[in-house]
Amino acid sequence: MKKGQVIEGIVQRVDFPNKGIVACEEGTCVVKNALPGQKVKCAVNKVRKGKAEGRLLEVTEASPLETGSPCPHFGSCGGCTYISLPYEEQLRIKEEQVKKLLDSVLCSQGDYQFEGIKASPVCFGYRNKMEFSFGDEWKDGPLSLGMHKRGSFYDVVSVTDCQIVDEDYRKILRCVREYFTALQERGIDVKFYHRLRHIGYLRHLLVRKAAKTGEILIALVTTTQLPEQVKKDAEESLLTEDKDLFTEVQILEGLKQALLSLPLDGRIVGILHTRNDAVADVVKSDETNILYGQDYFYEELLGLKFKISQFSFFQTNSRGAEVLYQTAREYISGYIQSSDGADAGKIPDKVVFDLYSGTGTIAQLMAPVAKKVIGVEIVEEAVEAARKNTELNGLHNCEFIAGDVLKVLDTIEEKPDIIILDPPRDGIHPKALDKIIRYGVDHILYISCKPTSLVRDLEVFLDRGYRVDRAVAVDQFPWTANVETVVLLSQRKADDYVEV
């Protein structure tokens, strides 16, 4: 197999993350965005040590597993790779991927309890947050608002019938795109921000909706590069006699009124205007102004209430998050109560560290079955939100510290009895992992959103005297290639292993 060669073959399986293994006469090639059983053409773009990687050119024959996509944007939108497969088949693929990765490192420890995969309680309309991009679907095409086209950094598909959000999102998306398209038709040149030339006004539309309360927060993200026909404020507009000029305030007021007039199932509690002049194509704020209502909303999980702002981290599938956190709580609570011989209502004398704690969701769920929970999170805004949420929920045994886990662990006087880990996708820094292991706690709970990072860290845990007792995959993201994994580790007795 040579670089540049076009091959055709059958996808034998899909490994995490989204790597289709294509078998052909010349050997095998790894290709993204392919499904098991598909016949595909791909171009080989890398050959190294006998292993080939390629780019998908065409699906020449559908997989016998495919049943058709309920989403009209499938194939053009880069979002939902698995949406043409039945949900049960998606779960089977994800379960096999996680089990294969775990087995690859746990074969040395012997048996462990793998509990399969837990399905999301809802498959359609499950997302509570979407970041839509402004752009065009082709060069100099009409204004688009939606998701990036598959394989493209620049082209944007208007996903007006997206299936992973509910109808309120779709109405808001259509409303905003039609509003700015109408302004363009009136000669007001509100262009999208061009990512190469770094010019333009419209950047992103952020929509968040609570699954339980139905509260909706909307944020329009723009640059400060106003179109020529638009002035910043009324005072600036008075300096010219051109009556066709608009102010930015007028444009934003018109958008606000258009949004508030929508017939929605949920309730808009806040509309924000965020300015962002950063070069990077990320949703961030240089300045945020409230156009309507407030800059936060409330969501409820497992009997707790959470105040969520524009940029607060929160699991994007609220009902799926309840399954994830119930699993984590059951793993830890079962250990605490059995080891103490305590009744379910009794609070044991245990200190829990929740590392990479985000907005403190897990910490607050663990608080009722622990003496104290200490959360550590590097994002200061998330820590502030965690502190406010503990007050909101009347929890007095939680402490949250803002800082890098690697550095903060050296400053905490308390010693943990149990450690909960929920790190970013790339896993735990090796030096932080060493400090965590040196506490020598009996049990560690590891929640991972990227199983390849998880198994890399598990190898270190196993080498340092821990074993995996229980593991389960949890599907938070139907139709996509992503999957969460929950693992409970316990410390082996000294005579069970030899450290070298």
Where are these regions (language model features)?
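Local cysteine-cluster metal-coordination motifs and their immediate loop/turn environment
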Residues: T67-P86
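Flexible, glycine-/basic-rich loop-and-beta segments that form/coincide
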Residues: S63-P72, Y154-D155, R492-V500
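Rossmann-like S-adenosyl-L-methionine
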Residues: K2-G4, E8, R13-P17, L217, ...
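Composition-driven low-complexity segments enriched in polar/acidic and proline residues
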Residues: S108-K139, G151, V207-R208
